[in-house]
Amino acid sequence: MLKILTLMLLVTFHATATTYKVYYLGGQSNMEGFGENVDLPAHYRAPLKSVPVFQGNPVADFKPNGGLGLWDILQPGFGRQFYSDGNTNQHSDYFGPELSFGHQIAKLHPQQNVALIKYTLGGSALGYGVGNNWYPDYRRGNGINQYDHFLSTLSNAFASRDIDGDGEPDTLIPAGIIWMQGESDAYDSEITASRYLDNLKTMMALFRAALRSPDLPVVLGKITDSGMDPEDGLRMNWGSLVQQAQLDFVEQDSCAALVSVTESFIHLDDGWHYTSADYLTLGRQFAERIAQLESQCATHSYK
């Protein structure tokens, strides 16, 4: 009986409510991630049980089940080809910036708990009518697009008040937005690229509103051109317009920053995506930059 009572006391002691700083990671394929799990160093291969992750099921516009998911633990397999039906997660053979980001942000906040929410889809754009689309006032087809799938992801993630499974409700405090996107807008047309700044401002304002924190830190990843186009070397003819829009955004927003380490990255033969090592570098840089912004930008708990 004494042993049973002791065990019950231990379980009760450990099952306490936890406060988590929550980071949202979104964008298109270079946030989705083409890093290959087989390339990972040993310390990234093991699950990091202290960092919960909710990844919304990525689907195209008009499709159902976007944003389905469940809280999991950080590990390889949240890159491209990840799938969730809301009951089980099917991890893939790929990872994205979330992996090293989660490891690094946890190191930068050793006295706090961190959690990640991710929703991203390759080829998606902010410009209206371009590919799979984030434009909030979407009117094509049934009107469902990437913005809706993002909202579903948040709704599903925050619906679970016990994200670590210890039986106690947790407090989730939005702490930052990490956004790696813009290639599709830079590739589509000059008109779409020239509207990127306005579209980016609108989208980040909506993200902040959805997370109920108007001054939430935002870190952007700079898009870069591989130079692999056979005609003129430019994969994105209007890339400079989107790059300038990214610079303008962070100059005009005191709670935003741009990570430009991508300028040194090596692209895969497809001309769009990065190497496994570069995804690890990108995630770490995202973590370093968002941590710097957090001290100067107020955050509020999600209620």
Cite the ranges covered by each PLM segment.
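Cell-envelope and extracellular/periplasmic
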Residues: 18-302
